[in-house]
Amino acid sequence: MNLQNEFLDAFFSQTRSFFLTGGSALNLFYFHHRVSEDLDCFATSPEEFSLVNGIIRTVCEKIGATYNSKQDFPDFKRYLVSRDNETIVVDCVNERVPQIFPQKNVFGNVRVDLPEEMVVNKLCALLGRMEYKDLIDLYTLNANGYESLKYLEIS
């Protein structure tokens, strides 16, 4: 098992308050359309988010990895997790914006955002940062029946 998958399995065995979203969620659990360089783990509770440093430490001990905190803000934390010759970026976010689709799918231990929610998030991301990866994800979502125009108004 590669570091990314092993990290996800261990992370979500420690918490049910977070969910995976973004490009990695789309690639690993829905469409397998591109490689994503980071894991976006979101929480919707400040109390649960406050526990993330301990969760990361426990997970890294469990899987034999090391971690470095690269950014540490009240609602955003970025970690580099490394083992042997693999390194992944783990972004943890306290999501203060209400979820339009609060239910999540579960694959094994991993809670994963719904494609519908990710369409809305990708539309908002396009307006804010205009990165190619967001266009690729939106194209893939559209090609798989999640039409962006349908979600534009609620974005």
Residue ranges, per PLM feature:
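Compositionally biased terminal segments of proteins
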Residues: 1-155
